[in-house]
A protein has these predicted regions:
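C-type cytochrome heme c attachment motif
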Residues: 281, 363, 439, 713-726, ...
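Electrostatic cytochrome c docking/interface patches
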Residues: 686-716, 731, 744-746, 770-771, ...
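Post-cleavage N-terminal segment of exported redox proteins
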Residues: 14, 369-379, 442, 471, ...
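C-terminal capping alpha-helices of c-type cytochrome domains
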Residues: 31, 103-104, 109-110, 172, ...
Length: 837
């Protein structure tokens, strides 16, 4: 066996530090401990200060019924610690929460006690009409089957649907993991299926469900700013080229995971940055008065893997942004974040609860500015209509949203003139005007369109008036295209994008020519760096596809809009498109256009197999593209015949280019480019650990029985003696392997992700003179401190000379040290380590 030298601490401590580290301007307090909120997977704050926590004792990989609930917490004396709690509802796998008025929207699974097997994941709403902290009855379904049941049953809820958040447009936005979903059904009968991850949205009553964006990996939540910019912080695919991504989610956008981001980058909206390894979790956009300016008006993004809440400083860049990340609050395996109407920030900490939950791990932290004093959020139900309208001008994004929801609940159209007054009040901050725009549009529906279009003449709010007007498809279908076509000529790129998206929703083919003329794709860029120039052509193409604008696109092949037209055509699998392209291929003498047409035909030669949920691409999927499971369709034979004919009649140089195109699009044409050969032989076992995600390694423990004797031999072959004491009498070097008190999953994680958890004994001793000693703490008393470095060499210092002794926040141990092992060998190793005495 190949020898491995373990460079530092192999085994993690039995617990992770539970103290949140906040900037000096802020202060934190423990709001609840694991006795009330163990394994908190999500939370939300009601504006009145009630905190709802989703307790998920199954974690990402656990199974079984009766291990989830939503707990309501209250801090009645506002001292930073919950002093009242009730079990609001028993629900399996609570993963997303929104509290509005007396309603709690919950994303959860159902696991009957009679079988212990999951039957589905749903978006539901619960009501507490008497305010006793307990749901009045059973959840009412808004969306049924919002994940892929087979994979939730076999794996657990790890790549499933997760966080939910409401925007100022009144939609509920849902973070879809890359399990995707099959036959998700809203209350109006709308059914959708989606292969892969993205963002879904639905009205609060469960109607009008639609895909908002697609092509993400395993996002956990969405952050929504007052202008309906949506941001996500994603999840790494464990070395496959898609790491943590901070992404601006633009309506109708395709982000490319896993089949487009590497080889078809020109067809995606790239991430704003790739941040390396980690696990993005709960996020929000924070805008609350009373907080220090530098921590306000920012996306706050949790990262479970890095145990930090981050801030991303976003700077406008045309229709999108650039960004700069900075650490904000350290929180042990942060799972979620939210704020109440009084400006109290709440963080859910998983805190080492593992992959299957732990009743003794997890907590909720409260963070406020130093000097913060409690100011009660008003009881909105008792406010007059005019005072509610004034609330739309609040400096608090929390207040504006909940004021809006109270107005909509009352449904008083008599408030519309006052709301319109806020829309047209140029002295009001833009956040207030935008809140008024979306409130007005929802309150009046189609009856408010004429006023919104009149207000759209104000350049400062044009983007939002256009968006609000076309936001609901039943209304959008009735709109004229002229104002939106005119908006495509705006000097403001954000207005152009809003208009392009709206024209696709309006659905009138007459707009196709304007969309084609407005869109010029930039040069292809990277999949993980900002490229704001691609946004307008990207959304225009998706609108052209929605419009089924075949004739307009074929006509544009002789114009400056040629590239956008071909981009749209290769996304439309119809006989009319194929025949039109073949006709143009025969009639043109432009060799470059011919090659572009051949590229489009290559793309159209197959299409994606409809997703039925019977399979999943795993945590490390094939990234070749352009389809994951390409299948032939009615026009495939015709395209192959034309492609072969063109190839035979081409020069050697053109043949080479056609062969490359065929290979790139995986046409599998014998004699033209590469033909894929499926290797049916069993995959080699060596190196399985390196090729397998950490979640799948954990799942393998359920199937593979570890052998302690074999594990001992494997450990000795890994030369751990270089850094650890393996038997009694060994010199203490790195953390002790003789007396490990961790679960199999915890030991495995500490090997596969050594930076995730650090042993409490792995410390830095800082002296009064500024010097420091790194190593394993052997002795600490009022007389002396002794540490052993990684070679086992002791350093003894006087306690009076020591300034501090702190647990290390990083490790010398590199990841990948067990990569060459098979899953069986790794299971044997863990069996030995977990049974050591």
């Amino acid at each position: 066996m190949k020898k491995h030298v373990l460079a530092s601490a192999l085994i993690a401590a039995t617990s992770i530090s539970g103290l949140a580290a906040v900037p000096s301007e802020l202060e934190s307090s423990r709001f609840s401990d694991s006795d009330l909120t163990p394994s908190p997977a999500c939370l939300c704050a009601h504006p009145n200060g009630d905190v709802f926590v989703g307790v998920d004792m199954l974690g990402s990989l656990g199974k079984g019924a009766g291990k989830g609930k939503v707990v309501r917490l209250r801090d009645t004396d506002h001292d930073g610690k919950a002093d009242e709690h009730t079990d609001f509802a028993n629900l399996d796998n609570p993963r997303g929460l929104i509290a509005v008025d007396d309603k709690l929207y919950v994303l959860h699974t159902v696991i009957p006690a009679s079988t212990g097997v999951m039957t589905g994941m749903h978006l539901s709403v619960l009501t507490d009409s008497d305010g006793d902290g307990k749901a009045d009855g059973e959840p009412r379904r808004l969306i049924k089957n919002i994940s892929c049941l087979k994979h939730n049953q076999s794996r657990g809820a790890d790549h499933t649907t997760n966080g939910i958040r409401m925007g100022i447009d009144g939609w509920i936005y849902i973070a879809i993991g890359d399990f995707g979903f099959v036959d998700a059904e809203g209350t109006d009968g709308t059914k959708l299926s989606m292969l892969g991850g993205g963002v879904l949205r639905v009205r609060p009553d469960g109607t009008e469900m639609e895909v908002y964006t697609h092509g993400m990996r395993n996002i956990y939540d969405v952050a929504i700013d007052p202008f309906m910019n949506i941001f996500t912080r994603g999840n790494t695919n464990d070395g496959g080229g898609w790491n943590i991504r901070f992404t601006h989610q633009i309506q109708s956008g395709e982000y490319g995971y896993p089949i487009l981001f590497k080889n078809f980058t020109d067809e995606i909206i790239p991430a704003l940055i790739d941040l390396g390894g980690g696990s993005g979790t709960g996020v929000m956009f924070f805008q609350e008065p009373g907080w220090p300016e530098k921590y306000n008006n920012v996306p706050m993004m949790g990262d479970w893997g890095r145990s930090h809440l981050y801030i991303h400083r976003v700077t406008p860049d045309g229709p999108s942004f650039t960004q700069k990340e900075e650490k904000f609050i350290q929180c042990s395996q942060i799972a979620d974040v939210d704020v109440d109407g009084s400006g109290r920030l709440y963080l859910a900490a998983w805190n080492g609860a593992g992959y299957k939950g732990n009743p003794k791990k997890g907590y909720v932290e409260r963070v406020v500015p130093k000097g913060w004093t409690y100011k009660a959020f008003p009881d909105l139900s008792k406010l007059s209509g005019p005072n509610l309208v004034k609330g739309l001008k609040s400096e608090s994004s929390t207040a504006r949203l909940h004021v809006q929801q109270e107005i909509l609940k009352r449904g008083d159209a008599g408030l519309a003139p006052a709301i319109l007054g806020v829309i047209n009040d140029k002295s009001c901050h833009k956040e207030g005007r935008v809140a008024a725009i979306f409130t007005y549009g929802q309150l009046l529906g189609g009856k408010g369109i004429s006023a919104l279009m009149a207000s759209s003449k104000d350049a400062a709010i044009q983007e939002f008036c256009l968006r609000a007007a076309a936001d609901r498809k039943p209304i959008a279908r009735t709109l004229p295209t002229a104002p939106f076509v005119q908006a495509l000529k705006s000097d403001d790129k954000r207005v152009q994008v809003a208009a392009a998206v709206a024209l696709g929703r309006i659905g009138k083919g007459a707009a196709a020519e304007a969309l084609l003329k407005a869109s010029v794709p930039p040069a292809p860029g990277s999949h993980d760096k900002p490229n704001s120039g691609v946004v307008l052509p990207h959304v225009a193409v998706h609108s052209l596809v929605d419009l089924e604008a075949v004739d307009a696109c074929l006509k544009a092949l002789d114009s400056s809009s040629q590239d956008v037209a071909l981009w749209a055509l290769r996304k439309m699998h119809t006989a009319k498109v194929v025949d039109g392209l073949l006709a143009k291929l025969d009639s043109t003498t432009d060799e470059e256009l011919q090659l572009k047409i051949m590229t489009a035909l290559a793309r159209l030669s197959t299409k994606e197999q409809p997703y039925d949920g019977s399979w999943w691409w795993s945590t490390k999927p094939d990234t070749r593209g352009p389809y994951y499971k390409p299948v032939a369709w009615e026009q495939s034979e015709k395209i192959e015949k034309a492609y072969r004919a063109a190839y035979e009649n081409s020069s050697a140089e053109v043949k080479n280019r056609l062969a490359d195109i065929a290979t790139r699009h995986r046409m599998n044409l014998k004699g033209i480019g590469k033909v894929e050969v499926v290797d049916k032989a069993a995959a080699a076992k060596k190196g399985e650990v390196g090729r397998t995600s950490i979640e799948d390694v954990m799942l393998s423990f359920e199937k593979l029985k570890g052998n302690k004797k074999r594990g001992k031999k494997i450990l000795s072959g890994m030369a751990c003696v270089a850094c650890h004491n393996l038997k009694k009498g060994d010199v203490i070097k790195g953390p002790d392997l003789l007396n490990i008190k961790l679960s199999k999953e915890q030991i495995a994680e500490s090997i596969l992700k050594p930076a995730a958890t650090i042993s409490d004994s792995w410390v830095t001793v800082t002296m009064n003179d500024g010097t420091a000693h790194l190593g394993t703490l052997v002795t600490k008393n009022d007389k002396e401190v002794i540490v052993h470095d990684i070679a086992g060499i002791p350093t003894k210092v006087k306690a009076s000379d020591v300034k501090s002794v702190k647990t290390q926040t990083s490790t010398l141990m590199a990841p990948g040290l067990a990569n060459d092992l098979s899953l069986q060998q790794f299971s044997d190793l863990i069996a030995y380590l977990s049974k050591k005495e």
